[in-house]
């Protein structure tokens, strides 16, 4: 929607793709205002793992790490290690000295995340992924979503519908709309770099890309400001309407 302003960006890393069978091991989130200025009292100068990322308008950065069961740790996960750099062999919750806990068995972590998700729209790239994991792993999320307390904004359809650089080809029939490609086209990620595949770092380039993209669309009278645009936050939400 053309009035969207304060949003919470979020990205999760997991040990697989089935939310009923795998584990959330990394959650990164931060906030950004799409219209109003960055809060003057928000700490500045946050340092991301990728030193060339600049915090810019982002604030409230948070990175949360979680563990896996002993059996999962013993098997390891080479695919996830290669993709994210996270070695689940070091994250067994059964180790006496382990500081890691299972996210889906940690009520306080779930409550804290849900409270944040309810306070403003949350943004994710291919938000269906995050939404599916939250539905099964965050107590109260499904009820809150059904009651209309959750609004989800997805940058994937923004890329598909409104990014003119998303050109269909043989490899990408609907255009290349990965976060990596979208962020590069919107100037949020240098062409020589790659998406990091860590929650907070990926959240950051997503929000930077989204804000730049909205600025372009506004200036050109397209997207939310075009003929089919609408006021308000937009996004996807549930809840009864009378």
What is each stretch, according to the model?
Residues 1-138, 146, 173-187, 191, ...:
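Conserved non-catalytic scaffold segment of RNase H-like nuclease domains
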Residues 136-141, 161, 165, 185, ...:
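Active-site catalytic microenvironments for nucleophilic, acid-base chemistry
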Residues 143-146, 154:
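A mobile, often basic/glycine-rich helix-loop segment
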Residues 150:
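A cross-family kinase active-site recognition segment
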Residues 153-174:
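Short alpha-helix plus adjacent loop in nuclease-associated cores
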Residues 185, 200-242:
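Acidic two-metal-ion nuclease catalytic site recognized across multiple nuclease folds
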């Amino acid at each position: 929607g053309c009035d969207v302003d304060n949003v919470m960006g979020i990205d999760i890393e997991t040990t697989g793709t089935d939310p009923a069978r795998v584990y959330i091991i990394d959650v990164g989130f931060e906030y950004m205002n799409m219209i109003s200025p960055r809060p003057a009292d928000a700490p500045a100068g946050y340092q991301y793992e990728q030193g060339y990322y600049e915090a810019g308008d982002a604030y409230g950065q948070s990175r949360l790490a979680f563990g896996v069961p002993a059996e999962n740790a013993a098997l390891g996960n080479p695919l996830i290690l290669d993709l994210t750099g996270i070695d689940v062999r070091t994250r067994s919750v059964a180790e006496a000295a382990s500081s890691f806990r299972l996210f889906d068995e940690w009520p306080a972590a779930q409550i804290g995340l849900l409270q944040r998700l309810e306070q403003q729209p949350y943004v994710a790239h291919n938000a269906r992924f995050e939404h599916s994991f939250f539905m099964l792993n965050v107590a109260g999320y499904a009820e809150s979503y059904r009651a209309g307390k959750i609004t989800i904004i997805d940058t994937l359809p923004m890329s598909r519908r409104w990014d003119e650089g998303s050109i269909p080809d043989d490899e990408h029939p609907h255009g290349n709309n990965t976060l990596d490609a979208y962020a590069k086209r919107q100037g949020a990620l240098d062409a020589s770099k790659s998406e990091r595949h860590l929650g907070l770092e990926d959240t950051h380039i997503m929000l930077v890309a989204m804000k730049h993209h909205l600025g372009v669309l506004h200036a050109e009278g397209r997207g939310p400001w075009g003929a089919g645009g609408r006021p308000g936050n937009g996004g996807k939400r549930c809840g009864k309407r009378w």
